[in-house]
Amino acid sequence: FPENEFPFSTATLSDPLTGRTGSLFRGDATDPLLIETNTSTEYWQKGASLLHTDPLGHQDVVLPDNSRVYMIAGTQHGGRAGAPSDPGPDINPRNPHNPMPAVRALLVALDEWVVSGTPPPPSRLPTLTGGTLVEPDKTGFPAVPGAAVVRTTNRVAPPGDWVHPKPPAESYRTLVCKVDDDGNEAAGIRLPDI
């Protein structure tokens, strides 16, 4: 993904792969109040853990006071009410879990934050400290007969030559949420369906 380039986080961090230091924010009065929501998809496919860990995924980072990050547990990118669960050509059924109730509530929270100064709830996300942010092969998915379990994430690496691309020599460590005994993500916003 072209947007997967350091800096990933609103916290100021140093990137050992590129030698750069930076943040998505400038650290001045122009920085917005920011709420970012992510589904499980963003953790597995786009490296969303890099929003709240150092680039090598060794420690949680403290986000600035004007930034919140929320993972909506057990949801997929583009999930919606009434989405079909028929697997189509895929092995596993599609996920019918709808993230929109949380997104709507957080939009109201953002409006209240901007208009009246009422801060939204603290970030809700998996963390290294809490033991809920793990390597993709350490999630703890229970065995489900006939179901394939993903054990790898998409690689996130510093961008190279877009004309004559070569495989990256190094990549960032992307992590995902640990699951509970039922196979549901153990952290983030767990909506009533979960």
Protein language model annotation of sequence segments:
Residues 1-194:
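C-terminal His-loop and adjacent cap/lid subdomain of alpha/beta-hydrolase
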